[in-house]
């Protein structure tokens, strides 16, 4: 395998300094300290305490955890790599989250809290009845967690450590998994959220330092556009334009038919996929469900949205600068050159961020950036482990063992994390053999093929009282068949390298995966609507407090029994959140317009 045979070609010759080792040691010590502190203060001896932090979490750790959970090492490496390869447009994946995060807190969370659920499949069972949809969603979420989220973060983190330090791939990955699992098992969601808050601070500080040094290398932001346009490798493929940076690299909105990230797909298709991730995926929603009241959930979403503005300047633009500074490595197009630079023939854009770290960061700060990547990896993995444990315990094990007590459920929840560790370690050889240039595309393709049907049943379930179990199930099945067919075709007919004729079937060649997400969403909605109208309507208990139109009115101010706030104080903070949300959207629109 290319990744194995050339792995030593790009291992750094320099050794870690004592200062670097001290910085990394301090980082791990802080993690252990925060983990022990939060584990000791957390109520982890009940199901609600372990899986939902006792529903007593404040807004600031929720917001930090929402951000940290979504910014794993896969996004650090992937966003910088996509920026190096194609420019700014990939920032849309981050900025689109603003509107969906607000929808989570203002629309979805009131429904979820009023329904008194622990997992999202549990809500679907209450809303539609029956067990088959809940089981399907739980299994689907577990599969997506293991084979997309964990795999991408592990690969990207291991790639970074290998390039920067030359550490053994297996040893560093297993050590990271062990540390992550230790404090996740010990303290539950509260520990995960508080350590995520620490990771967020470390990630932002380290990324800011590297971004400032990168911009200084090229003379500031004003020089980026001209410098990026000239970032051409010395060796190119004759009679092709593969080596040329995109002409629309500095623009967010790209042509619907010829753009690599068409504006239609980034506006509508991405919103469908983002709604699944931010509003219906257990990993994310679990943080908002832990809020002490709805106002804290709203404030957490607002904080996370502001933080999601940062990756443009902290990851994507530094990735573009990396191509400017190292065009022969980051921008390589000749397979033999790419093999030399990073061990992958298809391209080396994914080494953009670690390359910057190794070339620009001095002794000490290099250790800080290694800690940053470890922070990104740990925060993402802890989130996935805790949420996957919750899904299996509450949606699968409790159905197999209805008489299971709280002690048994807590034990099973901890054992599931151990099993996930084993599966993750077993997946490492597959990751090493995978093409590093395709990981980010692989993740998005899988999401576009499997997520839209889930988004559809949640949207219709919340906003359409007539939707029932028959319609939801057959809508899901129709979406699964069509989405799985697309996935199979993508694996059978991979996208050809630049410079080769595209002979893939027309549905793959002509239909962008973001546009496919739109079509799949509409298909699922149509089948679900038809199935619901052709079968009996849902019972009253399946819509009471379970749809937007049947929600109890006291949830409009974020009331929660026992939160210790007067109605006047709740109303005041609700208005503060509303004003902040409007201001946030104005800031987001300004940035979109500026980089349009």
Curated annotation (Swiss-Prot):
Cytoplasmic side stretches: 37-72, 121-149, 195-200, 286-300, 377-409, 465-471, 535-575
Chain ranges passing through the membrane: 16-36, 73-93, 100-120, 150-170, 174-194, 201-221, 265-285, 301-321, 356-376, 410-430, 444-464, 472-492, 514-534, 576-596
Free-text tissue specificity from the UniProt record: Predominantly expressed at high levels in kidney. Very low expression is detected in testes.
Domain of life: Eukaryota
Signal sequence interval, chain numbering: none
Extracellular side, ranges: 1-15, 94-99, 171-173, 222-264, 322-355, 431-443, 493-513
Keywords for the protein's UniProt record, in alphabetical order: Cell membrane, Glycoprotein, Ion transport, Membrane, Phosphoprotein, Sodium, Sodium transport, Sugar transport, Transmembrane, Transmembrane helix, Transport
UniProt keyword Membrane present: yes
Membrane topology: Multi-pass membrane protein
GO terms assigned for molecular function: fructose:sodium symporter activity; mannose:sodium symporter activity
InterPro entries given in the database record: Na/Glc_symporter_sf, Na/solute_symporter, Na/solute_symporter_CS
Annotated GO CC locations: apical plasma membrane
Changes seen on gene knockout: Mice are born at the expected Mendelian rate and have no apparent morphological abnormalities. In response to long-term fructose consumption, they develop exacerbated hepatic steatosis associated with massive urinary fructose excretion and increased hepatic triglyceride levels.
Catalytic activity entry: D-mannose(out) + Na(+)(out) = D-mannose(in) + Na(+)(in); D-fructopyranose(out) + Na(+)(out) = D-fructopyranose(in) + Na(+)(in)
Primary location: membrane
Places the protein is found: Apical cell membrane
Residue positions the entry lists as glycosylated: 4, 96
Phosphothreonine: modified positions: 148
Keyword Zinc appears in the UniProt entry: no
NCBIfam families given in the database record: sss
Family: Belongs to the sodium:solute symporter (SSF) (TC 2.A.21) family.
Main function: Electrogenic Na+-coupled sugar symporter that actively transports D-mannose or D-fructose at the plasma membrane, with a Na+ to sugar coupling ratio of 1:1. Transporter activity is driven by a transmembrane Na+ electrochemical gradient set by the Na+/K+ pump. Exclusively recognizes sugar substrates having a pyranose ring with an axial hydroxyl group on carbon 2. Has likely evolved to enable renal reabsorption of D-mannose, an important constituent of oligosaccharide chains of glycoproteins.
Protein name: Sodium/mannose cotransporter SLC5A10
Organism name: Mus musculus
């Amino acid at each position: 395998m290319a990744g194995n045979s050339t792995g030593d070609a790009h291992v750094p010759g320099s050794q870690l300094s004592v200062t670097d080792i001290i910085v990394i040691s301090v980082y791990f010590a802080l993690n252990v300290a925060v983990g022990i502190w939060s584990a000791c203060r957390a109520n982890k001896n009940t199901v609600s305490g372990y899986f939902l932090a006792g529903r007593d979490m404040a807004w600031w750790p929720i917001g930090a955890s929402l951000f940290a959970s979504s910014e794993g090492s896969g996004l650090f490496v992937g966003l910088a790599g996509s920026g190096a390869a194609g420019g700014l447009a990939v920032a849309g994946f981050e900025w689109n989250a603003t509107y969906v995060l607000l929808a989570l807190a203002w629309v979805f969370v009131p429904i979820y809290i009023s329904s008194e659920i622990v997992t999202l499949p549990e809500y679907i069972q209450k809303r539609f009845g029956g067990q088959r949809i809940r089981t399907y969603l739980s299994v689907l979420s577990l599969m997506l967690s293991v084979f997309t989220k964990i795999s991408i973060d592990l690969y990207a983190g291991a790639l970074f450590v290998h390039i920067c330090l030359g550490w053994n791939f297996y040893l560093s990955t297993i050590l990271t998994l062990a540390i992550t699992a230790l404090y996740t098992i010990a303290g539950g969601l509260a520990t995960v959220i508080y350590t995520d808050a620490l990771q967020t601070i470390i990630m932002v500080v380290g990324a800011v330092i590297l971004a400032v040094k990168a911009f200084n290398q090229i003379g500031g932001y004003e020089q980026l556009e001209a410098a990026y346009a000239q970032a051409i490798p010395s060796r190119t493929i004759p009679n092709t334009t593969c080596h040329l940076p995109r002409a629309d690299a500095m623009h967010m909105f790209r042509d619907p038919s010829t753009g690599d990230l068409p504006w239609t797909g980034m506006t509508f298709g991405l919103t469908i996929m983002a709604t699944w991730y931010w509003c219906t995926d257990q990993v994310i929603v679990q943080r908002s469900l832990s809020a002490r009241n709805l106002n804290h959930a709203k404030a957490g979403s607002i904080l996370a949205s502001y933080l999601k503005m940062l990756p443009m300047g902290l990851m994507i633009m530094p990735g573009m600068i990396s191509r400017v500074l190292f065009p022969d490595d980051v921008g390589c197009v000749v397979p033999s050159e790419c093999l030399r630079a990073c061990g992958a023939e298809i391209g080396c854009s994914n080494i953009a961020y670690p390359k910057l770290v190794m070339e620009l960061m001095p002794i000490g700060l290099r250790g800080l950036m290694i800690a940053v990547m470890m922070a990104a990896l740990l925060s993402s993995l802890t989130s996935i482990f805790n949420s996957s444990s919750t899904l299996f315990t509450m949606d699968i094990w409790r159905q197999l063992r209805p008489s299971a007590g709280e002690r048994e459920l807590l034990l099973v929840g901890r054992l599931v994390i151990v099993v996930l560790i084993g599966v993750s370690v077993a997946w490492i050889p597959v990751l090493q053999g995978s093409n590093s240039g395709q990981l980010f595309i692989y993740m998005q393709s899988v999401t576009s093929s499997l997520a839209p049907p889930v988004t559809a049943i949640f949207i219709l379930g919340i906003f359409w009282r007539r939707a029932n179990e028959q319609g939801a199930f057959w809508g899901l099945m129709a979406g699964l068949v069509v989405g799985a067919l697309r996935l199979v075709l993508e694996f059978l007919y991979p996208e050809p390298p630049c410079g080769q004729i595209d002979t893939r079937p027309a549905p793959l060649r002509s239909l962008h995966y973001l546009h496919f997400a739109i079509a799949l969403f509409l298909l699922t909605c149509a089948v679900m609507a038809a199935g619901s109208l052709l079968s009996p309507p849902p019972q009253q208990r399946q819509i009471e407090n379970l749809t937007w139109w049947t929600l109890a009115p006291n949830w409009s101010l974020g009331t929660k029994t026992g939160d210790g706030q007067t109605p006047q104080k709740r109303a005041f903070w609700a208005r503060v959140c509303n004003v902040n949300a409007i201001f946030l959207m104005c800031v987001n629109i300004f940035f979109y317009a500026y980089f349009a």
